[in-house]
């Protein structure tokens, strides 16, 4: 896969404008410097919403056409904090090793 940070930043800017998340974090192999030719772009979107699955589908649909495969994880701040409070390894790794691409001001 040909990962292009400029194209990703443009996609994040559109996502931020349209959905106004609190944060967007790049995680996984591209963030951790361990990508392989089949790696997708993993994004964690933090937004206070009543239905994270519905929002994930909306965001997913808005990101077409895609220059590379994207895998989305949408969480509310409460979900994120609850999982951090129980030392959830996956969420802790996203926070500790991920790259913050967007934060609401």
Where are these regions (language model features)?
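Catalytic core of pol beta-like nucleotidyltransferases
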Residues: 1-23, 32-37, 47-105
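Conserved H-loop
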Residues: 29
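Short beta-strand->loop micro-motif that forms the acidic, two-metal-ion catalytic signature
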Residues: 42-45
């Amino acid at each position: 896969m040909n990962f292009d940070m400029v194209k990703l930043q443009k996609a994040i800017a559109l996502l931020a404008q349209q959905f106004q998340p609190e944060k967007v974090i790049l995680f996984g192999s591209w963030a951790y410097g361990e990508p392989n030719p089949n790696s997708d772009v993993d994004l964690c979107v933090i937004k206070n919403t009543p239905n994270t699955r519905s929002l994930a589908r909306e965001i997913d649909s808005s990101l077409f056409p895609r220059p590379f495969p994207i895998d989305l994880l949408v969480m509310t701040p409460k979900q994120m904090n609850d999982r951090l409070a129980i030392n959830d390894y996956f969420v802790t790794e996203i926070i500790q090793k991920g790259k913050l691409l967007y934060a609401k001001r």
